[in-house]
Amino acid sequence: MAPKRLKPKYLIFVLLFVAAAVFAVAWDLSRLNTDFNKMFALLRTARTDAFYKDTTVIVRCNGKTVTVTDPNTSTTTTTTIPLIARVDYDTTFGKDMIIFTWRGTEQYNKRVHGGEIMLRSVLGFRRYIHVNCTGLVTEGRYPEDE
């Protein structure tokens, strides 16, 4: 008895399905990395402006919208980052906002080490941005409370 052979149309269907799945995962990761880099650069720029211009910069997250405000120059920048899933950063002025000064963020933080922002893709991939009390913006999780 000869072994069964796959019909060409089934083989093409399976290969197209695998290619579509690989493309979907690559596209999802690309969106996550693009939004991560955009948010990371936004926070680093806010910290740099606060440090070198000796001013206060307020970063507010309202859902998927991020607003950066410099009260001294009345400059406001608003951008949308669709993959923001959670902002875990509380200040004395309110929730979901980060206030950068030339000394960092500790002056307005409610928690000792700062907080984090989580970005989650459609397929569930996650990346975290941690902003600590000195205003340093790094990739990673918020440290556990001590």
What are these model-predicted stretches?
Residues 2, 21-146:
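N-terminal helix-rich module
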